[in-house]
């Protein structure tokens, strides 16, 4: 007697048979890996590096890279220029064959950028002045950054110090920094140390307030609260959790404070309270060139230091912005 099957039963059996064949074929594609106890003990680690990623992102900015190379070339040349052959002393007065000073001589093969009003070589004084101004700018920027970051972190993170630091800030911030700069430069003996001290007295205030505001934003985030609950020390939280997040903005502020300090040196020297006239600096060179600005044949004495000052200012600004963008953790994957 023939057994009749429902068409749906036949379809189901066919489907199950095909599924079984597929499962068997899939099993043939795979095999168990042998167990290696030594490899099992090894742990994987990411090859990601924050600074490598930052430098890679920064190197993509061609303009910033060009300006960085230009600035490094200027800085290096300012230090090696006195050691090159055939260079004049920046402080020496050059006399002619008749024994008289070579005053305001036009650029020539002997004096590449000419001489100033007392016969000093402008090429030598330009690079010596650039070296002095860069030293002042870098030193002031580092002092302002060190003091400002320390005070700003404590101000923003330690709640008990908030009232005290706020009062200190209100007192110092209400005194115009220009007046302090002028008074200190007038009272103390003119010199590089005096300029640096005068600009550092109040220069850290802006950095401290900026860091304090940034710390307040990230102070009570979950990972910082968790660190405090686990008993992590305040110093470790500041160093490991807070400051790395602020690297980009700190670098930008430092990069901008360097031309700012150089500009302050130029200003204070321009009004006659800065470095002595015998000490070459961009401020002194611009002040000397200003007096000759109305003489068409001598305007070059103002143009040279102004061009160097412009290059330094623009370069630090562009480099600081580019590095800030590259170092921003938000831009890292």
What is each model feature region?
Residues 112, 143-148, 153-217, 251:
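Generic hydrophobic transmembrane alpha-helix motif, especially the helices
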Residues 2-149, 153, 160, 174, ...:
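Gly/Trp-centered helix-boundary motif
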Residues 185-189, 214-215, 263-308:
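Glycine-rich helix-loop "coupling/hinge" segments at transmembrane-helix boundaries
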Residues 120-135, 160-162, 166, 220, ...:
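Amphipathic cytosolic juxtamembrane alpha-helices at the membrane-cytosol interface
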Residues 137, 141-142, 200-203, 213-214, ...:
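Residue-level hotspots within the lipid-embedded alpha helices of multi-pass solute transporters
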Residues 66-70, 136-140, 168, 181, ...:
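Hydrophobic core positions of alpha-helical segments in small-molecule transporters
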Residues 74, 153, 182-186, 195, ...:
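Transmembrane alpha-helix boundary and packing residues in multipass membrane permease domains
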Residues 131-147, 235-267, 316:
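Transmembrane alpha-helices
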